[in-house]
C-alpha cells in the first residue's frame, strides 16, 4: 500500500490544482514501483487532516474546509477511475487543538465519511490516540454517515484488536516492539479485520522511520511462534495469517 502524504517541508496545496499535482506525484510513484519491481501497488489517496488544520490560519476555517472537501471529491474521482483504491488519510488532528477546531474537525470528518459511503469506498483514518474512546467516537460517526464500520480503517492503531476496544472498526496495527504481546492477548474470532503496518516514510531526513519495511515479516514470524506457544493449532495460525496478509487487505482496500 502506498499512502499519499503531504510534504510539510514544502508549501502545502492552496487550491485544487495544487492537490491535483500532489496526487499525481503519488500516482506516478506507484507507477514507477510497479514498473521497476513488478509488485502490485494499491494507492490510498486523500487530503490529510493535519493539512486542513495547518491551513486554518492562512486561509480561514471556511476556506480550508471547502478546499479539503474539494480535495476529497478529487480523490474519489481518481478512485472511481481505478487509479486509487481507498480514501485517506482522512480524520482528525492527532494533537491538541482548540475546541472550535476540534468540533469542526469532527463535523468535517462526518461529511467526508458520508461522501465515501455514497461511493462505496473505504477510508483510512488518521486520528488521535485516546484508547477505546477514539474508536467509539469513530464508530458513532460511521453510523451517522452510513459508512460500515469495517470500511473505516484506523491507521497506526494500538495493538488491541478486541471487539470491545475497536467497536467493529478495521485497523492496521503499528507493529513496533511490544505489539505482539498485545495482539496475542486480544485477538479473537470476533475481532474486526485488521492488518500490520510500519508507517514507513522513506524520508532521507528520518531514515527507517517510522518502522523499517522488514518489520512486518519479522513480526509475522514472531506472532506465529507466540500463538503456537500459547496453544493455537497450526491450521488456526495459518488461517489467521492468511486473513491478515491476504483476505482482509483485499476486502478492506476495495470498492464495493
What residue ranges belong to the model's regions?
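Active-site proximal loops enriched in glycine and acidic residues that flank catalytic Cys/His/Asp
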Residues: 127, 156-157, 173-175, 198
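Class I S-adenosyl-L-methionine
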Residues: 153-166
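Conserved short secondary-structure transition element at the edge of the structured enzyme core
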Residues: 188-203, 254
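Conserved phosphoryl-transfer catalytic core
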Residues: 229
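Short, structured coil segments at secondary-structure junctions
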Residues: 166-169, 190
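Short hydrophobic/aromatic-enriched beta-strand-loop microsegments
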Residues: 149-152, 169-177, 194-196
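Gly/Ser/Thr-rich loops at beta-strand to alpha-helix junctions
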Residues: 129-132
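Mid-domain alpha/beta scaffold segments of enzyme catalytic cores
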Residues: 1-119, 125, 136-145, 158-160, ...
